Swiss-Prot record:
Belongs to the UPF0177 family. Pfam families: Rce1-like. It is a multi-pass membrane protein. It is found in: Cell membrane. The chain crosses the membrane at residues 10-30, 44-64, 82-102, 119-139, 159-179. The lineage of its organism: Bacteria, Bacillati, Bacillota, Bacilli, Lactobacillales. One of its GO terms (biological process) is CAAX-box protein maturation. One of its GO terms (molecular function) is endopeptidase activity. Keywords: Cell membrane, Membrane, Transmembrane, Transmembrane helix. This is UPF0177 protein YajF. It comes from the Bacteria. It comes from Lactococcus lactis subsp. lactis (strain IL1403). Coiled coil: none annotated. GO terms for cellular component: plasma membrane.
Amino acid sequence: MINIWNKSKTVILALFLLFLSQVPLYYVEYENERQNLFGVANKITVNFILIGLLIILIAIMLGIKNGFYKNAKRTLEWKNIILILILIIPSVALDILFSQFIQFHHLGRMDNQIAIDSVMGSLLWFGKILGVALLAPILEESIFRASIYKIFSNNKIAFVFSSLLFTFMHSGYSWVFLIYLPMSLAVTFIYHRRSDVILKS
């Protein structure tokens, strides 16, 4: 019973973090009374950064409390950094390949990327750095990997579910799924490997 309650709390936490992740996007894309995108019209980089930092702080505090970052320092070991590069480089290459194939054959639109580009276009460079380098990675790690690995007791099932869920949330039912899948598999495998180290230590 306690185990079910703990898993339920993790699901609620993941949904809450998912909600928080949409707040900066909603703020930037809010249409004012002139029906202009509020962020694009007003270049709200400072406000975006303040909202983003608050959300990052909340996410980190909740993550620490729920054990999301246990043993996270191991990711920064040289062998793990090399592994990350080995995985990310071919993943990016596959992303580009699938993207070109899908665009050439008119199989789908990357609506998620278009939305991100719209948001990033309304921010100055330091706002873009916050969004890309801190806000997105921290929230995605918590929502799509740390939470799921706490919900499923079997790490292999967690790996598959996490990879597919992350990909689907970014692509929906479309060929664009193939674009996000390689990167999703790569970053999930990095987290999966760290989780296995934790379990075996």
